[in-house]
């Protein structure tokens, strides 16, 4: 029988994001639901899981304290992963703009220097967890949405760069890399701003996490953008984009709800889709990754996909196994 497991070793290491199971901080709170989700993801062929930083008792796998409470310790949890078909947790995604009961805030802002100490403290909690389970990286989404902060000033960009450098310094002491994630609503909008940010974060331990759908929705050509920044792209989130924000509705108040959830003026029913169903040129991107010798993690996502979540995982698994992985072994994957 053919091995259905998707490789997590080699030049491209495949994994899956756990965030699609939990839509809202109070949802998907039962421990047994989370364990079933790990089993379903493994059954789909993905044996590595990127966790998302969470908060409170409603998120059993969102904090190391919660994990220790449920499993006795972080190490016991890591040792038990194989029982559910999961080989490893390579990293955690951390958005300081989300509320945290443990740190006592309703969202912090990386452009505000007064928030830096607490963001750094919170990042350290998750970085130490990643190190303890044998992972490799922390992904941070540092920029606030445009509708909250407006145009990104040079001073604000410098503040974010200083915070990233501080977090990267802490993470490197644990043997981890730090990857910067940009989303469709981010106050950082242009390639020139990315250039400026990277110039202020020169450490080899700092890289970009390219989210194919988020960047496409924001109006970027992901393949061209990857070619421009390939030396610093160290991580990918693979998901498809079903539309582009051509009306610049990222400026709308509460754009997370007004645009992403409600669809904006065009009433887009769904922004994110399974691989191969939308606007992202995955074949062209894989060709560029092959040509430019990308080595690192590719984490597939089902962000806000339809219920049941398992169907998106299986469709993405099919696309990876039958379309993308065969292209990895061709001299010209785009052909």
Describe each model-derived feature in a short phrase.
Residues 1-136, 165, 207, 287, ...:
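N-terminal pre-domain/capping segments
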Residues 1-45, 128, 191-206, 210, ...:
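Histidine-acidic metal/acid-base catalytic patches
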Residues 161-169, 201:
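Histidine/acidic residue-rich metal-binding segments in metalloenzymes
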Residues 129-151, 174-183, 299-300:
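Active-site groove signature of glycoside hydrolases
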Residues 145-164:
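Active-site cleft segment of glycoside hydrolase catalytic domains centered on the general acid/base Glu
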Residues 173-202:
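Basic- and aromatic-lined ligand-binding clefts that recognize polyanionic substrates
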Residues 20-22, 53-55, 94-98, 142-146, ...:
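Active-site-proximal loop/turn and secondary-structure-junction residues that shape catalytic pockets
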